[in-house]
Amino acid sequence: IGEEANIQDGVIIHSHGGATVTIGARTSVAHGVAVHGPCAIGEDCFLAMRSSLYSATLANSIWVGMGALIMRATLDSHTYVPAGSVIRSRPDAWGMRFVSNKEKRYMEEIREAVNRLREDYMKSRAVANA
């Protein structure tokens, strides 16, 4: 799990038989996401609530919408996967649009909010242990 990655409540990450799951730096994995390895998730990605990955590879800066399912597919950088999409192979993702500037800003806002929460937690912990 990369630096400043954000893994939220109720996320399930697992794999079988020694397969690996990697999550890149600054990637946000929202509530209730399921990741079934082997999976490789790049840097600066956003996986919205209840999305699922199964044996998938995501390049950098990908947005996966709520409830989307990606299985046995490789997605290129900056791909936007709409909520509820089902991607069963690479061709299913062809023609999808790129992540917009608005979505990029949202991902950055999430990253900043999570960093503030972490910093506040560390400060309160230091005070409690003093």
Segments predicted by a language model, with ranges:
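Short proline/glycine- and basic residue-enriched helix-capping loop/turn segments at helix->loop/beta transitions
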Residues: 28
